[in-house]
């Protein structure tokens, strides 16, 4: 893929952003993917059956996304991660925007993300996806307790307990353009 964006950071340094589909040596990106999913076994369960996209800036891999087919014209975004020191700078948004463009002919795109299982508490990831047009669909109670050996804690100290699924329907958003 060609460079998709040129942007400036807070220091007004011009940066070139590249988004590339990775076909070989995907395992080299497991450390980056493990920022969003700490289970290497879980990452390996979807990495090699999915499409891996890497966003890099000035030659450094900053964000990664894995999307898999889950049915006829339905896909699931299994992982969207950004280096800790690069979070909240727009890289994840740029990569997600590109993914949504690439899969604009899909009937539906799903994403599952963690929740603390506490009423009126949600992690920033849920509002992040909602900003892009994802809508809440359902919750799998105790998903992280039942599927991960070690507890997973978010930046705010709350434990991931439930898996919250959201969906995005490209045709609803393509009409708005």
Residue ranges of predicted features:
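Conserved N-terminal entry element of GNAT/NAT acetyltransferase domains
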Residues: 1-24, 170-177
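Active-site rim helix/loop that mediates acceptor-substrate recognition in acyltransferases
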Residues: 27-64
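Conserved beta-strand in the GNAT
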Residues: 54, 60-69, 74-81
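A short, internal acetyl-CoA/4′-phosphopantetheine-binding micro-motif in the GNAT/acyltransferase core
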Residues: 80-88, 114-116
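Conserved acetyl-CoA pyrophosphate-binding loop and the N-cap/start of the following alpha-helix
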Residues: 86, 90-98
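Conserved active-site alpha-helix within GNAT-family acetyltransferase domains
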Residues: 93, 116-158
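Conserved GNAT acetyl-CoA-binding A-motif
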Residues: 103-118
């Amino acid at each position: 893929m060609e460079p998709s964006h040129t942007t400036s950071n807070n220091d007004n340094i011009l940066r070139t952003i590249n988004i590339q589909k990775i076909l070989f040596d995907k395992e080299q990106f497991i450390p980056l993917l493990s920022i969003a999913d700490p289970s290497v076994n879980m990452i390996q369960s979807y990495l090699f059956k999915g499409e891996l996209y890497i966003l890099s800036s000035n030659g450094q891999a900053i964000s990664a996304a894995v999307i898999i087919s889950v049915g006829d014209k339905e896909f699931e975004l299994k992982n969207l991660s950004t280096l800790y020191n690069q979070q909240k700078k727009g890289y994840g948004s740029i990569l997600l925007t590109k993914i949504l463009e690439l899969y604009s002919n899909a009937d539906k795109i799903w994403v599952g993300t963690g929740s603390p299982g506490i009423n009126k508490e949600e992690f920033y990831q849920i509002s992040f996806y909602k900003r892009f047009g994802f809508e809440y669909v359902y919750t799998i109670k105790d998903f992280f307790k039942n599927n991960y050996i070690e507890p997973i804690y978010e930046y705010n100290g709350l434990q991931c307990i439930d898996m919250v699924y959201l969906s995005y329907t490209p045709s609803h958003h393509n009409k708005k353009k």
